[in-house]
UniProtKB/Swiss-Prot annotation:
Motif (Nuclear localization signal): 1-12, 449-457
The keyword Iron is annotated on this UniProt entry: no
Lineage per the UniProt record: Viruses, Monodnaviria, Shotokuvirae, Cossaviricota, Papovaviricetes
Disulphide-bonded residues: 21-27
Function: Minor protein of the capsid that localizes along the inner surface of the virion, within the central cavities beneath the L1 pentamers. Plays a role in capsid stabilization through interaction with the major capsid protein L1. Once the virion enters the host cell, L2 escorts the genomic DNA into the nucleus by promoting escape from the endosomal compartments and traffic through the host Golgi network.
Gene: L2
Native species: Human papillomavirus 51
Matching InterPro entries: Late_L2
Listed name of the protein: Minor capsid protein L2
Length: 468
């Protein structure tokens, strides 16, 4: 992502600054001197113009009119433009009046040309108007009977035995339209075929049935925030108000309503925060409940704005604030109750014979003879009466053995002779054979001078490879 740099604003010109700050009297000296023409260069020209006549060159601090001759335009030349002139109209000649003719127009003296208009009608009689009425007793009858004709009605019924919709079977209906009667009857025997259906899904409730007609095909899980990464500063908050009033740790304002499960944004954080750990915080994200080392932890992520660039970019660290609510108690252990009473110290043998179990208590004794000792084992007995019921029970399957130890005769083990066998010792230059008479013997001294070789033992693998 390429960072966009903020566009620099153009500074105001000298004339704009002079027009705004002159009335208030806060103009800098260089602005006033440049606009009013009192700079050092202007003063040098004024002093030099007292003794030097520059004529009409227009050099100096005058009004800028170009002197007496004015400015001479640069460039010039070229053909002059052609001016279009319209043709002249001929003059209108007006006849002159003679001085002997009067200039007064006489009025029309003959009034016979005036017409008075149409004459006014005259009415005779004083009885007024006569009103006559007429009544008719015969009603108006409109003949709307159609002309006589023959109407032929034909119908076609096609039955499909593979598909018959039950709601389409309705009761017979009749209709009357201008002396034409239509009566439709539906009757007949409809056969059907029974097809064995298989149940693909049972009605056993597993607790995971969808609650909508189009359930979501997959379960979308939100990745848990990595609160303990190296990019976050871990800060522990011991004040329990951090759960219900987190904004009081950043600003001194007391809002009327503060949501708990939403993110909080601070437009202008205070220069001095109520809690030093929350200095320069501009955003506190929504909380999260996690379990950490056997505790229930309330966490919020915070964003600081320690630095601000000219482009408006805010730079700051990310902090993880957490508060331990309580510890998670260990799971309750259920106390198991014995199936049998403590008085009857019997064990149940799962391999006991059913015929022997019906006789009551069986106490067989099996003795195995051994040399110099005897071991006897007593098999456990079985109680056939167990009618008590318990909520939490245990079934002991272990058996106990009674092993009596008896003393036997002493066993004498063979011992080695206490005197070492005699081996004749001769000089080295004489060759003699070595006679072994006992468990210990001397090797021929010449064998010590021979080179010792490593004994190679071959190893055979299952694939037939021999390794040395």
């Amino acid at each position: 992502m390429v960072a966009t740099r903020a566009r620099r604003r153009k500074r105001a010109s000298v004339t704009q600054l002079y027009s705004t700050c002159k009335a208030a009297g806060t103009c800098p000296p260089d602005v006033v001197n440049k606009v009013e023409g009192t700079t050092l260069a202007d003063k040098i020209l004024q002093w030099s113009g007292l003794g030097i006549f520059l004529g009409g060159l227009g050099i100096g601090t005058g009004s800028g009119s170009g002197g007496r001759t004015g400015y001479i335009p640069l460039g010039g030349g070229g053909r002059p433009g052609v001016v279009d002139i319209a043709p002249a109209r001929p003059p209108i000649i007006i006849d002159l009046w003679h001085h002997t003719e009067p200039s007064i127009v006489n009025l029309v003296e003959d009034s016979s040309i005036i017409q008075s208009g149409s004459p006014i009608p005259t009415f005779t009689g004083t009885d007024g108007f006569e009103i006559t009425s007429s009544s008719t007793t015969t009603p108006a009858v409109l003949d709307i009977t159609p002309s006589a004709g023959t109407v032929h009605v034909s119908s076609t019924n096609i039955e499909n035995p593979l598909y018959i919709e039950p709601p389409s079977i309705e009761a017979p209906q009749s209709g009357e339209v201008s002396d034409i009667y239509l009566l439709v009857h539906y009757s007949g025997t409809h056969g059907y075929e029974e097809i064995p259906m298989e149940v693909f899904a049972s009605n056993v409730s597993t607790g995971t049935e969808p609650i909508s007609s189009t359930p979501t095909p997959g379960v979308s899980r939100i990745a848990a925030p990595r609160l303990y990464s190296k990019s976050y500063t871990q800060v522990k908050v011991t004040n329990p108000d951090f759960i219900s009033k987190p904004s009081t740790f950043v600003t001194f304002n007391n809002p009327a309503f503060e949501p708990i499960d939403t993110s909080i944004t601070f437009e202008e954080p205070d220069a001095v925060a109520p809690d030093p750990d929350f200095l320069d915080i501009i955003t506190l994200h929504r909380p999260a409940l996690t379990s950490r080392r056997g505790t229930v932890r309330f966490s919020r992520l915070g964003q600081k704005a320690t630095m601000r660039t000219r482009s408006g970019k805010q730079i700051g660290a990310r902090v993880h604030y957490y508060h331990d609510i309580s510890r998670i108690a260990p799971a309750d252990e259920l106390e198991m109750q014995p199936l049998l009473s403590p008085s009857n110290n019997y064990s149940y043998d799962i391999y006991a014979d059913l015929d022997e179990a019906e006789t009551g208590f069986i106490q067989p004794t099996h003795t195995t003879p051994m040399s110099h000792s005897s071991l006897s084992r007593q098999l456990p007995s079985l109680s056939s009466s167990m009618s008590s019921s318990y909520a939490n029970v245990t079934i002991p399957f272990s058996t106990t053995y009674s092993v009596p130890i008896h003393t036997g005769p002493d066993v004498v083990l063979p011992t080695s002779p206490t005197v070492w066998p005699y081996v004749p010792h001769t000089s080295i230059d004489t060759k003699h054979s070595i006679v072994i008479l006992g468990g210990d013997y001397y090797l021929w001294p010449y064998t010590h001078l021979l080179r010792k070789r490593r004994k190679r033992i071959p190893y055979f693998f299952t694939d037939g490879i021999v390794a040395h």
